[in-house]
Regions:
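Accessory DNA-binding and partner-docking regions appended to nucleic-acid-acting proteins
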Residues: 1-3, 337-338, 349-353, 363-365, ...
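Helicase motor core with emphasis on the C-terminal RecA-like subdomain
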Residues: 1-10, 14, 18, 22-44, ...
Length: 603
């Protein structure tokens, strides 16, 4: 079969996505490849189809066990013989997989990079025909990447020990120029075909919010996405448990995931999330790299991550099925202090020299500053991310919180003087909330308790809403005219940079929002909800019966296509996106009766 027949028969698609056909052609012709494609862009098909077109077995190197299991399960569901060999298998299961591989029963074998160091595995690979080697999450080979793994440095050594070097391809969703150079050199790619299909995920809406109360804001987001799958990322284990408890107390069941939990609990919680037994999971960045769940509708970062690589990969776990999804970051300046603490106390690079550690620390601070720049940007957030990865755009996306606000260049000199004066006159011992209350002329209990109503700055900004004052204070912090202490209750202090403003020696202009963010409704392909829910119920039943996640049976996109096309025979069912020959044979009889019944009732 040719590549188009394979695409339809096994994956149920009629055409390739951007870049896929070009990559497949180059790998199939025997050329190494470096492919940078966005999450959800269809990377795996780029090596799976060449594997099906070739004699022998493809070796896929993947960093996480859970991802291997999901991908192999999906391939088997599609009628493709594949296996994984890792530490979750018993010795007997590993022996069976190796025996089957030697008999040529598989087209793909998934392994972790650590497996390559085992002499027995090298012997296996030299006793069978290897069609190709695909390195997934290839950025893990680079010290400049956001998820460096020393085991990835052993890949080129393994390849060099093979009797016959196969074609080698490397895939990643995020790679700066420095990371890209490392991938090329450290994996030993030979005259590779290089392609970047673009980092943009057009179906994702990006938003940065700076709420006074993060919990209240989170509740609003979760409420807007009721009954939808969502991931909430926190910077620390303590925050994970605190946020999860808060959600549970407010009627939203949530699971937790962090490195402090036992393997059994982590595995169970991940499994419950993937299998739709619980819609929400609150986690540290230990969660998600091995998750292939396509119908995550929103990702919230309760705390700012350490760099844009981490952020884009974690946010990119939303909407892998191409449906519109939200990525919201709840930012506060205190998040910066947390990340600085992590950088200063990073012991992951203990085996490196002092000079190397300092170099990495300097790079980490540079990346942190870029991350803060994203959080404080008043220009298009999507362009900010894409520019960081070397993909330059000038037109606004109109699909992020910055683009949905209207900004105006405003002279804020006088208001800034009022804020700075208030901080000084109250002894530089209060936080944002109290300072804005004084300026607004609040009559709260705390104001009278500390006699702040007697201050000369009391009420001098009473013509402005508290939210406007808070926003300006935040912007002055961003511009380093004010600093915040790192205490449990952060206190505002003026910096040396502020004195020319206070003395009237310098004016200050800022781009301030003059129109609040427009509300963006979540939009999906219009389908009948009654039928869609019935198809989801059938999918869940079949998934539970087969002990696989629901999306392995069919994605939401496939169910929506069924709702739109209403197939009533097997030939029509084959025209549904994501339905190949194997799934037609297996599932047409399960879904067609539901569709027929719906049509009879409806029409």
């Amino acid at each position: 079969m040719d590549k188009f027949e394979l695409l339809k028969q096994y994956f149920g698609h009629d055409s390739f996505r951007d870049g896929q056909e070009n990559i497949i052609d180059n790998i199939s012709s025997g050329r190494d490849a470096l492919c940078i494609m966005p999450t959800g862009g269809g990377k795996s098909i780029c090596y799976q189809i060449p594997a099906l077109m070739s004699d022998g077995i493809a070796i896929v190197i993947s960093p996480l066990i859970s991802l291997m299991k999901d991908q192999v399960t999906s391939l088997n569901q599609n009628g493709i013989r594949a296996a994984y060999i890792n530490s979750t298998l018993t010795p007997a299961q590993q022996s069976r997989a190796i025996y089957n591989a030697m008999r040529g029963e598989y087209k793909l074998i998934y392994v972790a990079p650590e497996r390559l160091e085992a002499p027995a595995f090298l012997n296996l690979c030299n006793s069978i025909k290897i069609s190709l080697i695909a390195v997934d999450e290839a950025h893990c080979v680079s010290q400049w990447g956001h998820d460096f793994r020393t085991s990835y440095l052993k890949i080129s050594d393994f390849i060099s020990k093979l009797d016959d070097r196969p074609v080698v391809s490397a895939f990643t969703a995020t790679a700066t120029d420095a990371v890209k150079r490392d991938i090329l050199n450290l994996l030993g790619l030979k005259n590779p075909f290089e392609i970047t299909t673009g980092f943009d995920r057009k179906n994702l809406f990006f938003a940065v919010k700076r709420p006074q109360n993060k919990q209240k804001e989170l509740l609003a987001i979760v409420s807007e996405h009721k009954n939808q799958s969502g991931i909430i990322y926190c910077a620390t284990r303590k925050n994970v448990e605190k946020v999860s408890d808060f959600l549970n107390e407010n009627g939203y069941d949530s699971l937790i995931y962090h490195a402090g939990l036992s393997n059994e609990i982590r595995s169970k919680n991940q499994d419950d999330f993937i299998n739709d037994r619980c819609n929400l999971i609150v986690a540290t960045n230990a969660f998600g790299m091995g998750i292939d769940k396509p119908d995550v509708r929103f990702v919230v970062h309760y705390n700012m991550p350490k760099n844009l690589e981490n952020y884009y990969q974690e946010a990119g776990r939303a909407g892998r099925d191409g449906e519109n999804s939200d990525c919201v970051l709840l930012y506060s300046p205190g998040d910066v202090h947390t990340q600085k603490f992590f950088i200063e106390n990073n012991d992951e690079n203990a085996e490196l020299t002092e000079e190397q550690r300092e170099k990495i620390k300097k790079n980490d601070y540079y990346k942190l500053n870029e991350m803060v720049g994203y959080c404080t940007s008043t220009t298009c957030l999507r362009n900010y991310i894409l520019n960081y990865f070397g993909e330059y755009h000038t037109n606004e996306c109109k699909n992020c919180s910055a683009c949905l606000k209207e900004y105006k260049l405003t002279d804020v000199t006088v208001d800034s003087q009022k804020i700075l004066s208030c901080i000084i006159r109250t002894g530089q011992r209060f936080g944002t909330s109290t300072i804005s209350a004084v300026l607004a002329g609040s009559k709260s209990e705390n104001i009278y308790k500390y006699r702040l109503n007697n201050q000369s700055t009391y009420g001098i900004m009473s013509d402005k809403r508290r939210t406007v004052i808070n926003e300006l204070i935040t912007r002055l912090i961003d511009e380093e005219y004010i600093t915040q202490t790192e205490d449990k209750y952060p206190v505002l202090k003026v910096t040396q940079k502020s004195y020319p403003i206070l003395k009237g020696q310098k004016s200050l202009t800022m781009r301030l929002a003059v129109k609040e963010e427009l509300h963006r409704e979540i939009q999906h392909t219009e389908v009948d909800k009654v039928l869609f829910d019935k198809l989801k119920e059938r999918r869940k039943y079949l998934a539970d019966k087969a002990s696989v996640p629901p999306y392995v049976i069919f994605s939401d996109a496939s169910l929506r296509d069924m709702c739109a096309k209403l197939p009533t025979n097997e030939n029509d069912f084959l025209r549904i996106s994501g339905v190949g020959i194997k799934k037609q044979e297996k599932y047409a009889k399960e879904f067609i009766p539901i569709i027929k019944e719906y049509k009879e009732e409806k029409f």
